[in-house]
């Protein structure tokens, strides 16, 4: 397949319309039924959750039933992923997501966008994952610097009935910023919106599809307000010629894109209720939250070159809510009827699940003394476990200091060998490590608020590289890394997504321009830190009265 050089293609944009003009294979005045199914941000959740939610076995049952229904009505199905198959569940991470890709094969995925977390591993791992997958990895806007060539297929062509459908893959150019830089030495991430214009032109000149769809990993931001993130799907849709894409199957921001009103998503979407997708500049935009919690279903009618959406829904995959009864007892109940797990998928995945569990018992490091994480300590005083966790987050983010709720530390680690299971007992919640760049004045305001969190509560803060004296709601002698805070200087703070979004009453920082969600799970970050720094010296992390409350 030959592709036009970028500059030539851009120059031709002014001369050619982006609407498709195919050599038509479809019948005039005939209505075709096309169903697009989609998921995104799978993050290693090939197995059901501890509450029996989602998982690829139930997803296969659901997708199979939809395929059967659509086929009975004379229609066709295309199944797409918005990327980020990697990173999030130890049983998957330890096996380079092999169970996830093999499970996706069995379900019958047609294509996926390459997400930023596909680059959490070296490129050799991603190439191995391509070999496991029986569907193409699409990424139009990543190039090899040394050759100027694309590293992945920019698009794939599918024929459904007599309709020629092109699917483009695009990924956030933030990947270079939030990923591991050692893997990007010869990789260039170009602006996806600009690359989309080039690719659409290439397609219309060379392939002449009837329909063009983009599967993306760029994020959905209400009204295009992307803050410090790179522009997402909304911004791209607005930048393209109207209707040049039939739809964008998105990912990255991990939202149910269910609109409450124009340019505003529902804040707390309830599973099983109606979901109105976004539409910008004649282009539908969809996203199915995360982890396989939903399968998105978009039913289209194609007639005489036009794609019309006639139905859209997010279908929950065994999602449950916690209900407390009058007698005080509580249980988790399904939002919608239960979806049975597919036996063939269970047969495929069970050995991987068992292998992953066994690997959790493997030694990852050691420590020469107790790392104190007991509830009776972390909610009252600074502890060496808190310092180790925050040191790991600081190392991963390049932060100047770190803060987190003591209640997020759930266990101690005894002297001796450390296993991954030990780490997961300390940090079992799967929070994301995040950071924010703030002015010195903002740091003072933030830490003053955090210092109000009282002992004997989960909100009591564990801190690293911070010293102060707190008295009567004010801080004195506040220092970061031993130096007084400069109001005009910029500081980077590492914390967890839970606290960043206001958890435990902490000030929200996820709306700040300098906020970045790294996507890295807290336990994985701690595990890597232990591996790189073992044997740990417990005494080296012992607090020394840096912070005090009078």
Curated annotation (Swiss-Prot):
Outcome recorded upon mutating residue 393 to H: In strain: CDC 179-87
Residues annotated as binding a divalent metal cation 1? 41, 43, 84, 254
The subcellular localization recorded is:
Periplasm
Keywords noted in UniProt: Disulfide bond, Metal-binding, Nucleotide-binding, Periplasm, Signal
Q: According to UniProt, where does the site described as Transition state stabilizer lie?
A: 117, 120
What residues does substrate bind to?
429, 498-504
Q: Which cysteines are joined by disulfide bonds?
A: 258-275
Which residues, if any, are the signal sequence? 1-25
Keyword Metal-binding carried by entry: yes
- A Gene Ontology molecular function term of the record: UDP-sugar diphosphatase activity
Record note on what altering residue 139 to S does: In strain: CDC 137-85 and CDC 179-87
Q: Name one GO cellular component term.
A: outer membrane-bounded periplasmic space
Where the protein is mainly located, per its record?
Answer: periplasm
Q: Which domain of life is it from?
A: Bacteria
Q: Which cofactor does it need?
A: a divalent metal cation
Q: Which GO terms describe its biological process?
A: nucleotide catabolic process
Database matches in PROSITE patterns: 5_NUCLEOTIDASE_1, 5_NUCLEOTIDASE_2
Which residues of the sequence carry a binding annotation for a divalent metal cation 2?
84, 116, 217, 252
> What family classification does the UniProt entry report for this protein?
Belongs to the 5'-nucleotidase family.
The name this protein carries in UniProt is Silent protein UshA(0)
This protein's species is: Salmonella typhimurium (strain LT2 / SGSC1412 / ATCC 700720)
Query: What gene is this protein a product of?
Result: ushA
């Amino acid at each position: 397949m030959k592709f036009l050089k970028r500059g030539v293609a851009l120059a031709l944009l002014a001369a050619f319309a982006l609407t498709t003009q195919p050599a038509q294979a479809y019948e005039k005045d005939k209505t075709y039924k096309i169903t697009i199914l989609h998921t995104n941000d799978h993050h290693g959740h090939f197995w059901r959750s501890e509450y029996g939610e989602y998982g690829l076995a139930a997803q296969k049952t659901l997708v199979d039933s939809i395929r059967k229904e659509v086929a009975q009505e004379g229609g066709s199905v295309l199944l797409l992923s918005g990327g980020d198959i990697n990173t999030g569940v130890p049983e998957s991470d330890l096996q380079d997501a092999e169970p996830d890709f093999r499970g996706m094969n069995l379900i019958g995925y047609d294509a996926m966008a390459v997400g930023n977390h596909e680059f959490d591993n070296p490129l050799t791992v991603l190439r191995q994952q391509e070999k496991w997958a029986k569907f193409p990895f699409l990424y139009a806007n990543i190039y090899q610097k040394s050759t100027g060539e694309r590293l992945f297929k920019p698009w794939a062509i599918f024929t459904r009935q007599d309709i020629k459908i092109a699917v483009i893959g695009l990924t956030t150019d933030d990947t270079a910023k939030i990923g591991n830089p050692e893997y990007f030495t010869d990789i260039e991430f170009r602006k996806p919106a600009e690359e989309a214009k080039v690719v659409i032109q290439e397609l219309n000149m060379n392939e002449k599809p009837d329909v063009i769809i983009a599967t993306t990993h760029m994020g959905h931001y209400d009204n295009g307000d992307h803050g410090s993130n790179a522009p997402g799907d909304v911004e791209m849709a607005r930048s393209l010629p109207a209707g040049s894409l039939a739809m964008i199957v998105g990912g990255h921001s991990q939202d149910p894109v269910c609109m409450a009103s124009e340019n505003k998503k529902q804040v707390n979407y309830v599973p099983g209720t109606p979901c109105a997708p976004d539409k910008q500049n004649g282009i539908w935009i969809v996203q199915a939250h995360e982890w396989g919690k939903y399968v998105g279903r978009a039913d289209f009618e194609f007639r005489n070159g036009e794609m019309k959406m006639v139905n859209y829904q997010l279908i929950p995959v065994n999602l449950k809510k916690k209900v407390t009864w009058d007698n005080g007892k509580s249980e988790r109940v399904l939002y919608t009827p239960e979806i049975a797990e597919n036996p063939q998928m269970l047969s495929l995945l069970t050995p991987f699940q068992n292998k992953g569990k066994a690997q959790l018992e493997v030694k990852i490091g050691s420590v020469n003394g107790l790392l104190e994480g007991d509830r009776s300590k972390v909610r009252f005083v600074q502890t060496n476990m808190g310092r180790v966790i925050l040191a790991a987050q600081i190392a991963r983010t390049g932060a100047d200091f770190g803060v987190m709720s003591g209640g997020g530390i759930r266990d101690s680690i005894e002297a001796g060998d450390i296993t991954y299971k030990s780490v997961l007992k300390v940090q079992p919640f799967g929070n994301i490590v995040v950071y924010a760049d703030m002015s010195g004045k903002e740091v003072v305001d933030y830490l003053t608020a955090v210092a109000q969190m009282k002992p004997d509560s989960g909100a009591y803060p564990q801190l690293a590289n911070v010293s102060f004296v707190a008295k009567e709601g004010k801080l004195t002698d506040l220092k970061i890394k031993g130096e007084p805070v400069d109001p005009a200087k910029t500081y980077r703070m590492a914390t967890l997504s839970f606290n960043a979004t206001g958890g435990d009453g902490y000030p929200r920082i996820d709306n700040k321009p300098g906020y970045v969600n790294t996507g890295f799970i807290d336990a994985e970050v701690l595990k890597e830190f232990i591996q790189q720094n073992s044997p740990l010296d417990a005494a080296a992390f012992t607090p020394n009265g840096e912070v005090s409350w009078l």
